[in-house]
Amino acid sequence: MKLESIAVFAGIVSTALAGVYHKPPPATTYWTTIYAPSTSVVTVTSCSKGGCGTQSYATGVTKTKTVHEGVTTEYTTYCPLTTSHEVVKSTCSDTLVVWSTRSFSWVWSFSKPDGCGQSTSTIKTTAQTDVPTTATATPSVSTTCTTGTKTKWWWVIKTTDCSVYTVSSTSSSLISTSQVTSSSSIASTTATAPATPSVSTTCTTGTKTKWWWVIKTTDCSVYTVSSTLSSLISTSKATSSSSVASSTGSTPATTPGSSIESTPATTPGSSTESTPATATGSSTKSTPATTPGSSVTTGKTSTDWITSFTTHTAHTTTVITVTDCDHHSCTSNVVTTGVTVVTVTTTGTVTEYTTYCPLTSTETIVTSKTTSATTPGSSSVESTPGSSSATTPGSSSATTPGSSSATTPGSSSATTPGLSSVESTPGSSSATTPGSSSATTPGSSSATTPGSSSATTPGTSSVESTPGSSSATTPGSSTIESTSGSSSATTPGSSSATTPGSSSATTPGTSSVESTPGSSSATTPGSSTIESTSGSSSATTPGSSSATTPGTSSVESTPGTSTGSCWVSVSTGGYGYETTVTICSDVTSGQSVTTPTTISVPSTFCTTVPTAGTDETVITSYVTSTAHSTEVITVTSCADNGCQTHTTHTGVVVVTVTTTDVATTYTTYCPLTTTKAVYRVAKLANYKRDQTEFIATETNENTSNWPAPTLVPYVGISNDSSAAVSTFEGAANSVVPRLGLIAGFLSALLFLF
């Protein structure tokens, strides 16, 4: 009887506990939109850290953003005022939870002063006007949630995982301008939108182990084209700008370790006269200029990286501001033109503003502080056709584009004029011989007499004549191939056009060399290969040559395009990201192509945005661009330590924002405002969790005479000023004890007695 009474008592206690415990209602995320009538004054009240502050703004165009520890409030005034309130709290741990400001104290608590929370804005008007009847267009917001449970001891925890996806880029139709505001250089805007570079990103995930840790990695390949194209915007009035000329020339590359004396190149079909004799061991004299745009190869770089910006513009009217950023500082200069480019770098986010009325092309150059030269066996040289190049270490070098070239390294011998004749048809021929080699000079008589060797090869050497093909020689048994349409003479070691020895078939007074235009070839010992196209000659010398290195080096010449350059950059980000970037630049096309970028992401960092853990908070910064009636753009950049604002003349605004390998391009045509939120995660100390952190406030004041569409990213719309509009539900992380199990457990213990 006693045991039965105790069992009944335990059941009553369990029932009472089940009735007392109530599951709290789920938290929500909501947006509240408030409209202010006409153009007047708006008073915004912001509360943080136990106090409230009030600030008044003259409505015309006003942008105000406030971030409170994961809570973003956005105010946009266009003449009506639009106020948007968004509350998001997310975590990167077991679940991603979204809460509203009306969260329960046991979930999200912070001190709130009296008088706050009634309303976030107070509107004062000087005249009574009607509220707009049409709703403001906003981007769509999609949310997906999955529910589940997990157990810990005798507790059952219900979880809800929600993923919030927002539309990052927005577009608007062209707003025609009936009257241009005192801007004679910019006519009415056309409906042609500027072309933007294409961005393609592919990512692959994987894991790697280190001791007992499993690290998740994500490798992303980003390909970008730096130059942009757009159709020209017609100008009604062009101001002459004599200070800005069209620069079409290029800086030629010089040969390291040698002096080059050049004269203008000759045209095909004519002969070139030059002094045949040169002193042994001295630099030779050649007839053209050096090859512009020669390649630059760098090896491994240090972990520190430098990003610079180079802007190429077309000249017409107005002013261009070019900003070059290097490390932690930026410098600006102003040039008279018709294009304005503003580049802003804020906490790792690069924002580019381009206003044009004709065309702007911007190149982003990533270089390293210290570079090392390439080692033999892996070097490569690309030469530009139409001009010949010859690189010879030591003190001699000669290049002859459009004609013949001769390179004589080391102790090369001088040609001996006399009765010998040289027939050289313009085109491109070359002769390169290392060691004590000799070379012929086109347009004059010359004979090759290095040592006692000349145009024949004793032993196993052979001479072949094959039309239309280039020669290739290997050390040891030299081979000379004479092509009709291309001439070449290459021998490694101490041979020149022939292998040194005692045999000679060409002596001064009787020797003759015939060279026809086409393509010349040069060879280096080992396994090196040379590819050359018609119309250009190249010469490479093994040994300490700076152009090519023996081993597996190669020389390629492509017609119609200039040479390019490649460089490597390795950087380590602030959150443990290690990035390796290899960039190749094409001089002719003006484009910069970035090869796949590998990004290793440690597993301790979350890839979802926004994210925050139990000891983390979301820090949001904004980059806002506003264009007002083809006149002025005001750019405000905000980080967690403050905001900076500057203005510039504009009519068209192009904003490019790159965040976590996602590039977003915004194009505005007259009075559109676009805001991009940049999220970062910051650790918080435990004692700060219950405090309200005021992160950043952005204010942008301007006036406009014409109504404009309101663009509010990431928000939904409601004309109700109350804070009870719910768009979707998040997880309450409710903890429901299994009371039945506890009661059964107690009953079993009682029956044991």
Swiss-Prot record:
List all Polar residues biased stretches. 261-302, 555-565
- Bilayer topology term: Lipid-anchor; GPI-anchor
Start-end of Low complexity biased regions: 241-260, 367-554
Lipid tethering residues (GPI-anchor amidated glycine):
730
sequence repeats, residue ranges? 253-260, 265-272, 289-296, 373-380, 381-389, 390-397, 398-405, 406-413, 414-421, 422-430, 431-438, 439-446, 447-454, 455-462, 463-471, 472-479, 489-496, 497-504, 505-512, 513-521, 522-529, 539-546, 547-554, 555-563
What the entry lists under InterPro entries is as follows: Flocculin_t3_rpt (IPR025928), GPI-anchor_Adhesion_Reg (IPR052479)
> According to the record, which residues are glycosylated?
702, 719
List the subcellular locations: Secreted, Cell wall; Membrane
- Protein task: Cell wall protein which mediates cell-cell and cell-substrate adhesion. Required for biofilm formation and plays a role in virulence.
Recorded protein name is: Probable GPI-anchored adhesin-like protein PGA18
Q: Source taxonomy lineage?
A: Eukaryota, Fungi, Dikarya, Ascomycota, Saccharomycotina
Which gene is transcribed and translated to give this protein?
A: PGA18
